[in-house]
Amino acid sequence: MTSGKNGITYAEAGVDIDAGNALVDRIKPAAKRTNRPGVASGLGGFGALFDLKAAGYQDPVLVAATDGVGTKLRIAIDTGLVDGVGIDLVAMCVNDLVCQGAEPLFFLDYFATGKLETDTAARIIEGIAEGCVQSGCALIGGETAEMPGMYPAGDFDLAGFAVGAMERGTALPEGVVEGDVLLGLASNGVHSNGYSLVRKLVEISGNTWESDCPFGDGKLGQALLTPTRLYVRQVLAAIRAGGVHALAHITGGGLTENLPRVLPEGMGATIDLDTWDLPPVFGWMAETGGIAEAEMLKTFNCGIGMIVVCAADRAEALAELLSAEGETVARIGTVTTTPGIAYTGKLL
């Protein structure tokens, strides 16, 4: 057995345990900010504990979701603007959870890189914590994997895992009928899907991340890194108010493919494209790439990040409630008995 001053260390193989420990110490205050009723352990254990009774549940059903941020990370890595991608990660998971009618309870992250850069990792995880605070769920654990030889210098990847709960018998979708109203909640841009196409369009346009933004203020890279909106608190308030029959998070697949996922078999919807304002980024992308309207609608959110399907006699009250919660709400269509999505009006 080799020992003494000539022995090889783990650090010499590319894994810095001390850096990992320093990261945990730095992010503990951020994680602590996310504590909520039900959290029964802190960071550092072999597992994290959560007490559903302490969270107020009597007969809970658990709901789980996992997701990533996709190639939006490439822009964050190239620009060094990593602070918002943690919010993206949380949003992609918890916005899905709430579509089942569940309240997000806790979140875990997976951060992988070739060489751990403590400041970069801390900024990302602090963003994750901010996303958790905004959506009312606790950051109760995670994994930081330093894997030499697996990633180019400076690169990293992220995955998130969220668990929520609802009382038995309250799951969505439920009760969707012909004539139900579609309330569209505004997005703030591209959110976190379609970025392989976005990056191709930037290349075609001859711009760089440091170019002045052609569709708004500031630099192009910064504009494209606007964090995904979190809809959890607002939508949960609408669910509790009554009349919500289904929710659709508009991510990959756009309006065309995501709304049918929450409609009963044999049903569809009409959507009036003239009922909301298209964020400028989508017009720029369509023009730059000569992208057809139908392709835009099945790729991007096109300005609607979440659809609330509700009873017609509750639509006005729910729109007012959601507006009071800070949402920009548009009445964009209705449920029909014709399968698929039929569009009227003009997007572009």
Curated annotation (Swiss-Prot):
PANTHER family: TRIFUNCTIONAL PURINE BIOSYNTHETIC PROTEIN ADENOSINE-3 (PTHR10520:SF12), TRIFUNCTIONAL PURINE BIOSYNTHETIC PROTEIN ADENOSINE-3-RELATED (PTHR10520)
GO annotation, biological process: 'de novo' IMP biosynthetic process; adenine biosynthetic process
InterPro entries for this protein: PurM-like_C_dom, PurM-like_C_sf, PurM-like_N, PurM-like_N_sf, PurM_cligase
Family the UniProt entry places it in: Belongs to the AIR synthase family.
Protein name: Phosphoribosylformylglycinamidine cyclo-ligase
Broadest EC class assigned to this enzyme: ligase
Pfam families (alphabetical): AIRS, AIRS_C
Record-listed E.C. numbers: 6.3.3.1
GO-annotated molecular function: ATP binding; phosphoribosylamine-glycine ligase activity; phosphoribosylformylglycinamidine cyclo-ligase activity
The keyword Chloroplast is annotated on this UniProt entry: no
Pathway participation: Purine metabolism; IMP biosynthesis via de novo pathway; 5-amino-1-(5-phospho-D-ribosyl)imidazole from N(2)-formyl-N(1)-(5-phospho-D-ribosyl)glycinamide: step 2/2
Places the protein is found: Cytoplasm
Keywords: ATP-binding, Cytoplasm, Ligase, Nucleotide-binding, Purine biosynthesis
Gene name per UniProt: purM
Chief localisation class: cytoplasm
Reactions accelerated catalytically: 2-formamido-N(1)-(5-O-phospho-beta-D-ribosyl)acetamidine + ATP = 5-amino-1-(5-phospho-beta-D-ribosyl)imidazole + ADP + phosphate + H(+)
CC annotations in GO: cytosol
